[in-house]
Amino acid sequence: MPKANRRAFLRGAGVSLVVPPFLSLTRSANAASSLSSAAHPATTATGAPLRMAFMSIPNGVQQDHWFPTNSEDGIALSPTLEPLAKVKGKIQVIGGLDHVHATAGNDGAGDHARANATFLTGARARKTAGKDIHVGISVDQVAAQRVGAATRFQSLELSSDAVRNSGSCDSGYACAYQYNLSWSSPTTPVTPEPNPRLVFERLFGAGEHGQRQKNFDLRQQSNRSVLDFVLEDAKELARALSSEDRIKLEEYVSSVRQIEERIKSAERFGLVPDPNLPTPDGVPIDFGNHIDLNLDLMLLAFQTDSTRIASLLIAYDGSNRTFPDLGIIEGHHYLTHNQRVPELAKKVALIDRFYMQRFANFLEKMDKVRDVDGNTMLHNSMIVYGGAIADGNRHTHANLPVVLAGAGGGTLKTGRFVDAKQKPMSNLFVEMLNRFGVEATSFGDSNGGLSEIG
């Protein structure tokens, strides 16, 4: 095995498995350089990697079930937020943030596409169904372009929904607006990857694209795991680790194997697909499993320091997906426009909670992973969950549903509800960029920062 460095690899035929940087091997080899890097971007004051991620939910939320209150012991969680109970001391729920460029203005209908495009850009999307799309660079890509060279991948873009970059999708708005969160320039969306298998191969397959495909085919033919090809390197590495970190290595290897097995299973089995939502080959049919796999892959990418910036389109805005496992046969978008009927409003709240449960599971896993500085990965992260529509019935874009998880390496005050009092959502992004080590005086339609979060 090569001499230890910050990104040690377990290597085998067609496989390159990154070793998490928190292992004692990399910690001892890089303690001085790591702890002296506190002034570097995307790094905490202790020298650990600082991560940033963004996740979008569609169609707003059921207002009566979303917003919490503050109590003597922190956040008093609302019904939708109850899945966050185990990590409620490590999050902030932010109210009072607005996205004015998601409103109709002079552009008329098309709130869902417009909101999706505005969420991470803070910019107004040009109303067009043609190739002359124009919105703004997204906050994740501002960060990626400044600090992305520090990791194998500048950023990671994932989707649990379809991918569409051509045609008209919402009242004269191009599909690119509705199906992409990340934009590397005002005219260039960064297409997310919806196939967990391809994400897995990108993270752990060796070689260039064509060679990775050949290596994958070889493993499929022999019915072997990626881990089977690196066992000797793993044994050699384990001998160099402390007993505590050998356990961490075993846990990491086990998590990789479990995800690989879940991907294989998802490729073979699943629920009957929604007839209105054709599923591309290789994408899990079970929607909840698809979201969970994407979040677990994001966790592995962070854990191995393959990237420090990620985004996940949980579902495109305007999604009319049904949820038969929840006993919901009506489409989500339809339900949001019929919330005057109490029983239908309850179904919207159930869908909101379904999404929140996936997010909560992810945060709990992050909170169990120890980072190179001894803190948890969640402590050393800033994770935004929300959307650019507040009330899906009236298509409002003020007082948006936003959760900010993680302590940003100790720079954020968690365990509370914060009222931003009608500030642009872009102010939050300015604040996050600066705490990420990317100097920013403005972003999108910001009019300052959001010091309230710290």
Question: PLM features: residue spans?
Answer:
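Ligand-binding pockets and gating/stacking loops
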Residues: 1-454
